[in-house]
Amino acid sequence: MASKIEILKANLEAALGARVVSLTEAIGELTLVVKASDYLEVAKTLRDDPKLCFEQLIDLCGVDYQTYGDGAYDGPRFAAVSQLLSVTNNWRLRLRVFAPDDDLPIVASLVDIWTSANWYEREAFDLYGLVFEGHPDLRRILTDYGFIGHPFRKDFPVSGYVEMRYDPEEKRVVYQPVTIEPREITPRVIREDRYGGLKH
C-alpha cells in the first residue's frame, strides 16, 4: 500500500504534468517548484482538483537566496514560498516560485485564489521587495511609511540607513542618518578557579 506522500506525489504529477519544474521530498514533506508563468494556473489546480483539494493557504513568505550555500548558488535570487493544507485529504504541500527578474522581483498574487494570502504577500513585499502582481492593496505592513529599502534582503545593512528618534525641540519623531559606529568587541576571559560556583 502506498503512503500518503506517494499518493500525493502521483496526484500532483498527474494533475500538473510538464508544469512541474521539480517535486522533491525531504523529512516527510513535499516541495513543488513551478515557473512564474505557470504559478496562478498551478495554484488554481491545486485548489480545485478533487484529487488534490488544497483548500487553505496557511503561510506565505519571501526568501532571498543571494548567499544560499555559502554563495555557491547560481539560480534566481528571490522566491515566494507558500504552505498549503488540504483538510479533506489531510496533507500539506510547499509551493515555491522564483521571480524571473532579480532587479524587480514580480510574481502573481494568490489573493484571488486564497484570500489568506493578502497580509502574507504584503509582508513579503515589505521585507523582501517581492511585488505581487494583481494584489488589491500592496503596501507596507510592518515597517514605517517612510522606510527605505527592504530589511530582510541579504544586502540590506545590519544597522539600516536611517534611525528614528524623538526630538524634544520639534516635539515629533525625526529621521536622521545612522550614527552607529562599527566597533570590535574583545571577549573577556575570566580566569577564576571557582567562577560561578563551578569546581574544576
From Swiss-Prot:
The keyword Transferase does not apply. It is a peripheral membrane protein. Keywords: Cell inner membrane, Cell membrane, Membrane, NAD, Quinone, Translocase, Transport, Ubiquinone. It catalyses: a quinone + NADH + 5 H(+)(in) = a quinol + NAD(+) + 4 H(+)(out). It is found in: Cell inner membrane. Its EC number is 7.1.1.-. Signal peptide: none annotated. GO terms for cellular component: plasma membrane. GO terms for molecular function: NADH dehydrogenase (ubiquinone) activity; NADH:ubiquinone reductase (non-electrogenic) activity; quinone binding. Its main location: membrane. PROSITE patterns: COMPLEX1_30K. Pfam families: Complex1_30kDa (PF00329). Belongs to the complex I 30 kDa subunit family. NDH-1 shuttles electrons from NADH, via FMN and iron-sulfur (Fe-S) centers, to quinones in the respiratory chain. The immediate electron acceptor for the enzyme in this species is believed to be ubiquinone. Couples the redox reaction to proton translocation (for every two electrons transferred, four hydrogen ions are translocated across the cytoplasmic membrane), and thus conserves the redox energy in a proton gradient. NDH-1 is composed of 14 different subunits. Subunits NuoB, C, D, E, F, and G constitute the peripheral sector of the complex. This is NADH-quinone oxidoreductase subunit C. It comes from Burkholderia ambifaria (strain ATCC BAA-244 / DSM 16087 / CCUG 44356 / LMG 19182 / AMMD). The gene is nuoC.
